[in-house]
Amino acid sequence: MSAPTAPQTTLSTAPFPNSEKRYLIGTLYPQVRVPVRAIRQSATLEMIGGLTRQRPNPDVLVPDTSGPYTDPRIHIDLRRGLPHARPWLAADARLEVQAERLSAPLDGAGPLPFPAVPLSRRARSGQAITQMQAARRGEITPEMEFVALRENLRQAEAFELAQQHPGQSFGAAIPREITPEFVRAEVARGRAVIPANVNHPELEPTIIGRNFRVKVNANLGTSIVTSSIEEEVEKMVWATRWGADTVMDLSTGRHIHQTREWILRNSPVPVGTVPIYQALEKVGGVAEELTWEVYRDTLIEQAEQGVDYFTVHAGVRLAHIPLTARRRTGIVSRGGSILAKWCLAHHRENFLYTHFREICEILSAYDITFSLGDGLRPGSIEDANDAAQFAELDTLGELTRVAWEHGVQTMIEGPGHVPMQLIRENMTRQLQVCQEAPFYTLGPLTTDIAPGYDHITSAIGAAQIAWYGTAMLCYVTPKEHLGLPDRQDVRDGVIAYRIAAHAADLAKGHPGAQARDNALSQARFEFRWEDQFNLALDPERARALHDATLPADAAKTAHFCSMCGPHFCSMKLSHDLRADDILNGMAEKAREFRAAGGELYLDRPEGTP
């Protein structure tokens, strides 16, 4: 048998076309360097007095979740991990460095462990280190300034692109400018979270809350059937390239610990997990054998590695399980079904519910965020908004208050499969029951008839619920219900959900959200084809579809595409109309001048100023 080797994969590190990685520098904390992508535009050609003039167009700044991978100045070596984006952690006296990790992985022989596993940190005894605790003290942390800069992107500088329709925000309080103080207040209130484990220094922080840009999560992870560490690391890089704000490692196969370590050390975005999956592996896949002690040790193991948020299915209570008996599709959450089976086998309350305060103490020591799982979410539109789903939601509201007592940041997971007319009730109930803690939803899928296209059926519901107030959307890929997504599925899912998130930002009236739309629309009207491609969410696909019928370089300057041709292009006709209007207007003024006698100056009638 050959010796295990480090993951080797071909990473997607090329910068986006005609784009430049830039960094916004913090004012309160000069160590803060926020990456943004500047899309350079070509000049507009104008005819003035018979002469052609070039009018420059501003760069368009867009959020950049790709991390150092698209910065050609940074050398990427998976075996060393990413450069630290939060260097201030090393000097934080409230943290203590542990001589060794308290937990050891139980994966057995497998791929080469990460070569340089860092020592872990945790809060010193009596120290309150979470973002929520700092916010309540009135402290603006480096992470808070980081996300404030990231949300604004200095869009006001592109004032000519700033025209925007007013939004309808359904009670959200979105300011004209996101300041560090506004971020602090939202985190203190529990209305926003910044998932940022102290053991994930590679992380570029992001904020999740209804008063901020809608975020997108991409699920990754090995299964017992297929995939490998190499593939999952590449999927992480690929997902963040296309706009995933966070990723979740949902590995259920072998070598869960090693897979997670490689992903964390190379991830520029927050990483979430569902710890019950690894806990189940530790007891041989037998749900009845799970114990609080096994789960607790799994939490600590993953906390020491740097996981930023945990899905914890503490809301699946013994009394709720009979409510699912008449459902069309029963309990579809993996975590929910595992815990339901344990509860019924022992006829005892869910141990995650009974030990919830102890879980809070673990998470607060590392500043890990709760993602309270919806283990009883509907798996078909027939089961939407039923008694089981809302009974669990009520419990999640109760647990949110407990988590906040411990200063632990918390978001709430939501459905699922919900027809469009029932979506708003989900958002309204969640805001009321969970005191406006951020909502994080899987879709929802609005119909069950389209396997292979569920990235579309769910993006419809995702755009709608995000408009109503959902803070983060968990993507769905074309492989949903069919198999483990590959690289192309990840891309399709992320792009579909970036569209949904952006549509919701526009509908809510988020400041600056329309700037990119305005820039692309202007480029389209002026037939600046390369700018149209570069401003698109997926420049490669836009260019490929155009070039499939008009591949010649000359087509990049043509005033038509293959859809309408040169004589039926509505925008070309609009240009002609404008030119005719200008010429006709000048001719009319010339006639008026001649009719007035052709004099440069006319006598002013008496009594006029």
Curated annotation (Swiss-Prot):
Keyword set for this entry?
A: 4Fe-4S, Iron, Iron-sulfur, Lyase, Metal-binding, S-adenosyl-L-methionine, Thiamine biosynthesis, Zinc
Its cofactor is: [4Fe-4S] cluster
Q: Which reaction does it catalyse?
A: 5-amino-1-(5-phospho-beta-D-ribosyl)imidazole + S-adenosyl-L-methionine = 4-amino-2-methyl-5-(phosphooxymethyl)pyrimidine + CO + 5'-deoxyadenosine + formate + L-methionine + 3 H(+)
Q: Does the keyword tRNA processing apply?
A: no
Q: How is the cofactor bound?
A: Binds 1 [4Fe-4S] cluster per subunit. The cluster is coordinated with 3 cysteines and an exchangeable S-adenosyl-L-methionine.
**Hydrolase found in the keyword field:** no
Which residues of this UniProt protein bind [4Fe-4S] cluster?
C561, C564, C569
Q: Which Gene Ontology CC terms are recorded?
A: cytosol
Role, per record: Catalyzes the synthesis of the hydroxymethylpyrimidine phosphate (HMP-P) moiety of thiamine from aminoimidazole ribotide (AIR) in a radical S-adenosyl-L-methionine (SAM)-dependent reaction.
Protein's UniProt name: Phosphomethylpyrimidine synthase
What species is given as this protein's source? Deinococcus geothermalis (strain DSM 11300 / CIP 105573 / AG-3a)
Q: Which gene encodes it?
A: thiC
